[in-house]
Amino acid sequence: MRFPTPLIPATLVRRYKRFLADVLLPDGTAATAHVANSGTMLGIDAPGSPVWLSRSPNPARKLPYTLELVEADGTLVGCNTAHPNRIVAEAVAAGEIPALAGYATLRREVKYGRNSRIDLLLEDPVRGSAYVEVKNVHLRRQGRLAEFPDCVTSRGAKHLEELAAMVAAGHRAVMVYLVQRADCDTFRIAADIDPAYAAGLRVALDHGVEALVLGCALTPDGIGIDRTLRLSA
Protein backbone atom coordinates (compact mmCIF):
# COMPACT_ATOMS: atom_id res chain seq x y z
CA MET A 1 0.00 0.00 0.00
CA ARG A 2 1.44 3.33 -1.07
CA PHE A 3 0.49 6.55 0.66
CA PRO A 4 -1.08 8.82 -1.98
CA THR A 5 0.94 11.85 -0.88
CA PRO A 6 4.19 12.20 1.08
CA LEU A 7 3.69 11.93 4.83
CA ILE A 8 4.53 14.89 7.04
CA PRO A 9 6.91 14.35 9.97
CA ALA A 10 5.80 15.73 13.33
CA THR A 11 6.20 15.24 17.07
CA LEU A 12 3.49 13.76 19.26
CA VAL A 13 2.44 16.01 22.14
CA ARG A 14 -0.42 13.87 23.47
CA ARG A 15 -3.11 11.47 22.36
CA TYR A 16 -6.51 11.92 24.02
CA LYS A 17 -10.21 11.10 23.69
CA ARG A 18 -9.07 8.06 21.65
CA PHE A 19 -9.42 9.74 18.29
CA LEU A 20 -7.40 12.94 18.76
CA ALA A 21 -3.70 13.73 18.97
CA ASP A 22 -1.97 17.05 19.46
CA VAL A 23 1.23 17.30 17.41
CA LEU A 24 3.95 19.78 16.55
CA LEU A 25 4.68 20.25 12.85
CA PRO A 26 8.25 20.74 11.55
CA ASP A 27 7.90 24.53 11.64
CA GLY A 28 6.78 24.43 15.29
CA THR A 29 3.11 24.95 14.51
CA ALA A 30 0.70 23.09 16.80
CA ALA A 31 -2.03 21.00 15.18
CA THR A 32 -4.60 18.38 16.11
CA ALA A 33 -4.66 15.16 14.09
CA HIS A 34 -7.32 12.48 13.74
CA VAL A 35 -6.35 9.10 15.24
CA ALA A 36 -7.98 6.19 13.38
CA ASN A 37 -7.49 3.74 16.23
CA SER A 38 -10.00 2.86 18.96
CA GLY A 39 -7.51 0.89 21.07
CA THR A 40 -5.24 2.16 23.82
CA MET A 41 -2.17 2.32 21.54
CA LEU A 42 -0.26 0.88 24.48
CA GLY A 43 3.46 1.49 24.08
CA ILE A 44 3.21 3.74 21.03
CA ASP A 45 1.63 6.91 22.41
CA ALA A 46 4.52 8.40 24.39
CA PRO A 47 4.71 12.21 24.26
CA GLY A 48 7.71 13.34 22.25
CA SER A 49 7.58 10.39 19.85
CA PRO A 50 8.32 11.10 16.19
CA VAL A 51 5.17 10.60 14.12
CA TRP A 52 4.14 10.87 10.48
CA LEU A 53 0.89 12.40 9.29
CA SER A 54 -1.14 12.31 6.11
CA ARG A 55 -3.01 15.43 5.02
CA SER A 56 -6.45 15.26 3.45
CA PRO A 57 -6.96 17.22 0.21
CA ASN A 58 -10.53 17.97 1.34
CA PRO A 59 -10.58 21.64 2.43
CA ALA A 60 -13.85 21.10 4.30
CA ARG A 61 -12.46 18.45 6.61
CA LYS A 62 -12.35 19.66 10.21
CA LEU A 63 -9.09 17.81 10.99
CA PRO A 64 -6.95 17.69 7.84
CA TYR A 65 -4.20 15.59 9.44
CA THR A 66 -4.37 11.87 10.25
CA LEU A 67 -1.84 10.01 12.38
CA GLU A 68 -0.29 7.24 10.25
CA LEU A 69 3.03 6.12 11.75
CA VAL A 70 4.72 6.35 15.14
CA GLU A 71 8.37 5.70 15.88
CA ALA A 72 8.58 3.50 18.99
CA ASP A 73 11.67 1.70 20.28
CA GLY A 74 13.54 2.73 17.16
CA THR A 75 11.10 1.24 14.65
CA LEU A 76 8.15 2.55 12.66
CA VAL A 77 4.74 1.32 13.78
CA GLY A 78 1.52 1.61 11.79
CA CYS A 79 -1.32 2.86 13.97
CA ASN A 80 -4.05 3.62 11.43
CA THR A 81 -6.51 0.73 11.73
CA ALA A 82 -8.26 1.77 8.51
CA HIS A 83 -5.34 0.41 6.46
CA PRO A 84 -4.91 -3.31 7.32
CA ASN A 85 -7.85 -4.47 5.20
CA ARG A 86 -6.46 -2.67 2.18
CA ILE A 87 -2.92 -3.89 2.82
CA VAL A 88 -4.04 -7.52 2.99
CA ALA A 89 -6.47 -7.15 0.06
CA GLU A 90 -3.74 -5.73 -2.18
CA ALA A 91 -1.37 -8.52 -1.21
CA VAL A 92 -4.01 -11.19 -1.87
CA ALA A 93 -4.84 -9.67 -5.27
CA ALA A 94 -1.13 -9.66 -6.15
CA GLY A 95 -0.74 -13.31 -5.14
CA GLU A 96 1.70 -12.42 -2.36
CA ILE A 97 0.02 -14.49 0.38
CA PRO A 98 0.24 -18.19 -0.55
CA ALA A 99 -2.20 -19.22 2.19
CA LEU A 100 -4.90 -17.02 0.60
CA ALA A 101 -4.08 -17.61 -3.07
CA GLY A 102 -6.13 -19.41 -5.71
CA TYR A 103 -9.52 -17.72 -5.38
CA ALA A 104 -11.31 -16.24 -8.38
CA THR A 105 -12.77 -13.14 -6.72
CA LEU A 106 -12.21 -10.89 -3.73
CA ARG A 107 -14.84 -8.68 -2.15
CA ARG A 108 -14.48 -6.37 0.82
CA GLU A 109 -16.86 -5.46 3.64
CA VAL A 110 -19.49 -8.07 2.80
CA LYS A 111 -22.44 -8.47 5.18
CA TYR A 112 -22.53 -11.71 7.16
CA GLY A 113 -23.10 -13.08 10.67
CA ARG A 114 -24.92 -11.01 13.29
CA ASN A 115 -25.08 -7.58 11.70
CA SER A 116 -21.38 -7.77 10.82
CA ARG A 117 -19.27 -7.30 7.72
CA ILE A 118 -16.42 -9.63 6.84
CA ASP A 119 -13.25 -7.76 5.92
CA LEU A 120 -12.46 -9.93 2.89
CA LEU A 121 -14.56 -12.59 1.18
CA LEU A 122 -12.64 -14.79 -1.23
CA GLU A 123 -14.75 -16.90 -3.59
CA ASP A 124 -14.05 -19.57 -6.17
CA PRO A 125 -16.39 -22.00 -7.98
CA VAL A 126 -14.10 -24.92 -7.14
CA ARG A 127 -12.50 -23.97 -3.82
CA GLY A 128 -15.59 -22.39 -2.30
CA SER A 129 -15.56 -19.36 0.00
CA ALA A 130 -13.01 -18.09 2.51
CA TYR A 131 -14.09 -15.55 5.12
CA VAL A 132 -11.10 -13.46 6.17
CA GLU A 133 -11.09 -11.14 9.20
CA VAL A 134 -8.12 -8.77 9.62
CA LYS A 135 -6.85 -7.28 12.89
CA ASN A 136 -4.16 -4.63 13.25
CA VAL A 137 -1.32 -5.48 15.65
CA HIS A 138 1.05 -2.87 17.04
CA LEU A 139 1.70 -3.97 20.63
CA ARG A 140 5.17 -5.16 21.66
CA ARG A 141 6.03 -5.47 25.35
CA GLN A 142 8.99 -7.84 25.38
CA GLY A 143 11.69 -8.99 22.99
CA ARG A 144 10.56 -9.59 19.44
CA LEU A 145 7.06 -10.65 20.49
CA ALA A 146 4.00 -8.94 19.02
CA GLU A 147 0.70 -9.17 20.89
CA PHE A 148 -3.01 -8.55 20.36
CA PRO A 149 -5.21 -6.99 21.64
CA ASP A 150 -4.01 -3.89 23.49
CA CYS A 151 -7.36 -3.58 25.30
CA VAL A 152 -10.51 -5.62 25.87
CA THR A 153 -12.32 -6.20 22.57
CA SER A 154 -15.79 -7.71 22.83
CA ARG A 155 -16.25 -6.95 19.13
CA GLY A 156 -13.18 -9.03 18.34
CA ALA A 157 -14.58 -11.95 20.35
CA LYS A 158 -17.84 -11.69 18.41
CA HIS A 159 -15.90 -11.91 15.14
CA LEU A 160 -14.26 -15.15 16.30
CA GLU A 161 -17.67 -16.68 17.01
CA GLU A 162 -18.91 -15.63 13.59
CA LEU A 163 -15.87 -17.11 11.86
CA ALA A 164 -16.45 -20.41 13.67
CA ALA A 165 -20.06 -20.33 12.46
CA MET A 166 -18.83 -19.97 8.87
CA VAL A 167 -16.68 -23.09 9.30
CA ALA A 168 -19.68 -24.95 10.70
CA ALA A 169 -21.60 -23.89 7.58
CA GLY A 170 -18.97 -25.50 5.36
CA HIS A 171 -16.81 -22.50 4.51
CA ARG A 172 -13.19 -21.65 5.20
CA ALA A 173 -12.52 -18.94 7.80
CA VAL A 174 -9.21 -17.22 8.45
CA MET A 175 -8.25 -14.79 11.21
CA VAL A 176 -5.38 -12.61 9.96
CA TYR A 177 -3.27 -10.65 12.43
CA LEU A 178 -1.32 -7.94 10.60
CA VAL A 179 1.73 -6.87 12.59
CA GLN A 180 2.50 -3.30 11.55
CA ARG A 181 6.04 -3.15 12.90
CA ALA A 182 9.31 -4.72 11.73
CA ASP A 183 10.88 -5.63 15.08
CA CYS A 184 8.81 -8.76 15.82
CA ASP A 185 9.07 -12.34 14.57
CA THR A 186 6.67 -14.10 16.97
CA PHE A 187 3.06 -13.37 17.92
CA ARG A 188 0.74 -14.31 20.76
CA ILE A 189 -2.59 -13.27 22.21
CA ALA A 190 -2.27 -10.90 25.19
CA ALA A 191 -4.33 -13.10 27.51
CA ASP A 192 -3.54 -10.90 30.51
CA ILE A 193 -5.19 -7.95 28.76
CA ASP A 194 -8.23 -9.79 27.38
CA PRO A 195 -8.62 -13.35 28.71
CA ALA A 196 -12.04 -13.70 27.07
CA TYR A 197 -10.56 -13.02 23.63
CA ALA A 198 -7.75 -15.51 24.26
CA ALA A 199 -10.29 -18.16 25.23
CA GLY A 200 -12.41 -17.28 22.22
CA LEU A 201 -9.51 -17.78 19.83
CA ARG A 202 -8.74 -21.18 21.33
CA VAL A 203 -12.36 -22.23 20.80
CA ALA A 204 -12.37 -20.85 17.25
CA LEU A 205 -9.17 -22.71 16.35
CA ASP A 206 -10.61 -25.92 17.80
CA HIS A 207 -13.62 -25.45 15.52
CA GLY A 208 -11.51 -25.09 12.38
CA VAL A 209 -10.84 -21.36 12.12
CA GLU A 210 -7.32 -20.71 10.82
CA ALA A 211 -4.95 -18.08 12.22
CA LEU A 212 -2.43 -16.37 9.96
CA VAL A 213 0.08 -13.81 11.28
CA LEU A 214 1.69 -11.49 8.73
CA GLY A 215 4.39 -8.89 9.29
CA CYS A 216 4.95 -5.60 7.51
CA ALA A 217 7.79 -3.45 6.27
CA LEU A 218 6.98 0.21 6.85
CA THR A 219 8.38 3.44 5.43
CA PRO A 220 6.88 6.94 5.08
CA ASP A 221 6.20 5.96 1.45
CA GLY A 222 4.07 2.91 2.14
CA ILE A 223 3.38 -0.34 3.98
CA GLY A 224 3.73 -3.85 2.58
CA ILE A 225 3.62 -7.43 3.85
CA ASP A 226 7.07 -9.01 3.91
CA ARG A 227 6.94 -12.07 6.19
CA THR A 228 4.93 -14.60 8.16
CA LEU A 229 5.24 -14.69 11.95
CA ARG A 230 5.03 -17.70 14.21
CA LEU A 231 1.96 -17.97 16.45
CA SER A 232 3.09 -18.70 20.00
CA ALA A 233 0.89 -20.58 22.44
Curated annotation (Swiss-Prot):
Q: What is this protein called?
A: Sugar fermentation stimulation protein homolog
Q: Which domain of life is it from?
A: Bacteria
Query: Which family does the record assign?
Result: Belongs to the SfsA family.
The record's Gene3D superfamilies line, in alphabetical order, gives: 2.40.50.580, 3.40.1350.60
Q: Which InterPro entries match?
A: SfsA, SfsA_C, SfsA_N
Any Pfam family matching the protein: SfsA_N
Looking at the UniProt entry, the stretches that span the membrane are none
Which Gene Ontology MF annotations are present? DNA binding
